[in-house]
Swiss-Prot record:
NCBIfam families: oat. It is a multi-pass membrane protein. GO terms for biological process: animal organ regeneration; bile acid metabolic process; cholesterol homeostasis; heme metabolic process; monoatomic ion transport; multicellular organism growth; response to xenobiotic stimulus; triglyceride homeostasis. It is found in: Cell membrane. This is Solute carrier organic anion transporter family member 1A6. Disulfide bonds join C439-C469, C445-C465, C454-C486. Residues 1-20, 81-86, 185-203, 268-311, 378-381, 537-545, 624-670 are cytoplasmic. It comes from Mus musculus (Mouse). Residues 41-59, 112-155, 225-242, 334-353, 406-513, 572-605 are extracellular.
Length: 670
């Protein structure tokens, strides 16, 4: 009876003992981790408004993922290869699920979301306090009552999101370095670029799902089910609107946990691809045994770890590749993270629509670029030198094309007393704001309240009171204000809730912006595979896992963590009006100075990415100096067969005896 069960168990293990099955499981792991990451990036604006925090704190929350990753990335990358790599990937996916669940907790621990407003949703009487009434005292000032102020502790709930994102970053750590090294170790060298290309294309399902789920949740009110949405005086286009961000994180938690299950069934090692087809499994077993014996003869795992690190630090091509990666991430991360905010404030669309358009236009072009690039690398057998040249040319083309976005400008939304005068004359960003005018001085209005209305004269006002409106009709978001003294010059003196919409010319420029984005993403993804192959092939086989981990470490330390924080702080400097908390403290930014925001959003990343050109030329020069036998086939390129530089020779001499012992094994493996 035990024999059939044993056969079933062996058959089940054999089903998972294939590199292509592992590739499929790794694709789903990439999809789940990218789904969580993309969804987080689409919800940053919602979190900013939910917790009434600045953009710099939002950047800190976003960077906390990299902090978690940074804590363990180097040790996972190196020591993970000594352990069971598939199981470590499975544990990482489960930990990511836990992090997503913790992120969603504040919704269940906080009370209902209260947006800044003075308007009662059912008010339609001319005596309401938010309207213009002569000789009235300001009874709606921000409270200074300690009992009320203590409620503002709810805004500190963003710390749960911070901690959850750190845990999510820790869980994500083993997936890329251990997954890529597992494929590199057990796949044919000529199939490796294709498999990585398939992986890059397959993982694009993650952004597609994330960009679909983001707008869906953003259009649902955060407290849906517990409030009557008909009574809301805000819509998804309002900068105070908060979508149901917590729903998506619960979905991501479940997906990550389910994704972890298959990895617990993969073996620690696989037969080298091609050997099992030739019946040469015994040769692979001997090679594995020889490799294990060599490891046992090492003086110690810690010493080997530091020797490999020294090897990598003495590799000039590797270090230049790391430098270009850091500069690239500094530029690209800022563009990706804050693109929804830029589209919302520059082109006047809702956050949900911005997220949907980003996914619709960018995901297909990136997928096509990855697939075409991987296919070309395999079929044409691009050499290392040609791959470096192709990557640099494509990257420079993408950078130059992105500069065209500077020409696509929309006018700043006219807001009386903020961006324009009450006569409609545009004001400079540096000018002192004058919220009061002759038409509303008698109303004794609050000047910090953000309840924007759009007059039929095309000018927006910060509140119905500042527009001089004396009467309101209707309820909820359909409320109309009448008898507005500041609008009477146009012949009709009514206003509706919300900022005025941008003109059709701005909508056309949005389309041009998105089309340019499509081509930029396509060129960027085309350059990724050849650039990544240069990075992989500049290391020895046994150094790749640690090299990938070190690269990820530096990218997170010098780009992933600081970039969203300093960029968010710079964006805060372009804020025109801050929301107000109950105790009078500033909350989330309600509107930005569009021209300054545009110059910052497009200019700083362009400068950072443009600085990559210099180290890229040095990489090309170093590659051309290398004497690579048989550089006609990319599968034959390994640094161990090249002529080392003077600096590499100096570093190698310190552990020459160790290298001699393993030289025969290394050549057999290569």
């Amino acid at each position: 009876m035990g024999e059939p069960g044993k056969r079933v168990g062996i058959h089940r293990v054999r089903c998972f003992a294939k590199i292509k099955v592992f590739l499929l499981a790794l694709i789903w792991a990439y999809i789940s981790k990218i789904l969580s990451g993309v969804y987080m990036s689409t919800m940053l604006t919602q979190l900013e408004r939910q917790f009434n925090i600045s953009t710099s704190i939002v950047g800190l929350i976003n960077g906390s993922f990299e902090m978690g990753n940074l804590l363990v990335i180097v040790f996972v990358s190196y020591f993970g290869t000594k352990l069971h790599r598939p199981i470590m990937i499975g544990v990482g996916c489960a930990v990511m699920g836990l992090g997503c669940f913790i992120i969603s907790l504040p919704h269940f621990l906080m009370g209902r979301y209260e947006y800044e407003t003075t308007i009662s949703p059912t008010s339609n009487l001319s005596s309401n306090s938010f309207l213009c009434v002569e000789n009235r005292s300001q009874t709606l000032k921000p409270t200074q009552d300690p009992a009320e102020c203590v409620k503002e502790i709810k805004s500190l709930m963003w710390i749960y999101v911070l901690v959850g994102n750190i845990i999510r970053g820790i869980g994500e750590t083993p997936i890329m370095p251990l997954g890529i090294s597992y494929i590199e170790d057990f796949a044919k060298s000529e199939n490796s670029p294709l498999y990585i290309g398939i992986l890059e294309v397959g993982k694009m399902i993650g952004p597609i799902l994330g960009y679909l789920m983001g707008p869906f949740c953003a259009n649902i009110y955060v407290d849906t089910g517990s409030v009557n949405t008909d009574d809301l005086t805000i819509t998804p286009t309002d900068t105070r609107w908060v979508g149901a961000w917590w729903i998506g994180f619960l979905v991501c938690a479940g997906v990550n946990v389910l994704t972890s299950i298959p990895f617990f069934f993969f073996p620690k090692t696989l037969p080298k691809e091609g050997l099992q087809d030739n019946g040469d499994g015994t040769e692979n077993a001997k090679e594995e045994k020889h490799r294990d014996k060599a490891k046992e003869e090492n003086q110690g795992i810690i010493k080997e770890f530091f020797l490999m690190m020294k090897n990598l630090f003495c590799n000039p091509i590797y270090m230049l590749c790391v430098l270009t990666s850091v500069l690239q991430v500094n530029g690209v991360a800022n563009i990706v993270i804050y693109k929804p905010k830029y589209l919302e404030h520059h082109f006047g669309i809702s956050t949900a629509k911005a997220v949907f358009l980003i996914g619709l236009y960018t995901t297909p072009s990136v997928s096509a670029g990855y697939l075409i690039s991987g296919f070309i690398m395999k079929k044409l057998k691009i050499t290392l030198k040609k791959a470096a040249i192709i990557a640099l040319c494509l990257f420079m083309s993408e950078c130059l094309l992105s500069l065209c976005n500077f020409m696509l400008t929309c006018d700043t939304t006219p807001i009386a007393g903020l961006t324009t005068s009450y006569e409609g004359i545009q004001q400079s960003f540096d000018m002192e704001n004058k919220f009061l005018s002759d038409c509303n001085t008698r109303c004794n209005c609050l000047t910090k309240t953000w309840d924007p209305v759009c007059g039929n004269n095309g000018l927006a006002y910060m509140s119905p009171c500042l527009a001089g409106c004396e009467k309101s009709v209707g309820t909820g978001a359909n409320m109309v204000f009448q008898n507005c003294s500041c609008i009477r010059s146009s012949g009709n003196s009514s206003a509706v809730l919300g900022l005025c919409k941008k003109g059709p010319d701005c909508a056309n420029k949005l389309q041009y912006f998105l089309i340019i984005t499509v081509f930029c993403c396509f060129f960027y993804s085309l350059a990724t595979i050849p650039g990544y192959m240069v990075f992989l092939r500049c290391m020895k086989s046994e150094e790749k896992s640690l090299g990938i981990g070190l690269q990820a470490f530096f990218m997170r330390l010098f780009a992933g963590i600081p970039a969203p924080i300093y960029f968010g702080a710079l964006i805060d400097r372009t804020c025109l009006h801050w929301g107000t908390l109950k105790c009078g403290e500033p909350g989330a930014c309600r509107t930005y100075e569009v021209s300054s925001f545009r110059r910052l959003y497009l200019g700083l990343p362009a400068a950072l990415r443009g600085s990559i050109i210099l180290p890229s030329f040095f990489i090309l020069r170093l590659i051309r100096k290398l004497q690579i036998p048989g550089d006609t086939d990319s599968s034959e390129i390994e640094l161990a067969e090249t002529k080392p530089t003077e600096k590499e020779s100096e570093c190698t001499d310190m552990h020459k005896s160790s290298k001699v012992e393993n030289d025969g094994e290394l050549k057999t493996k290569l």
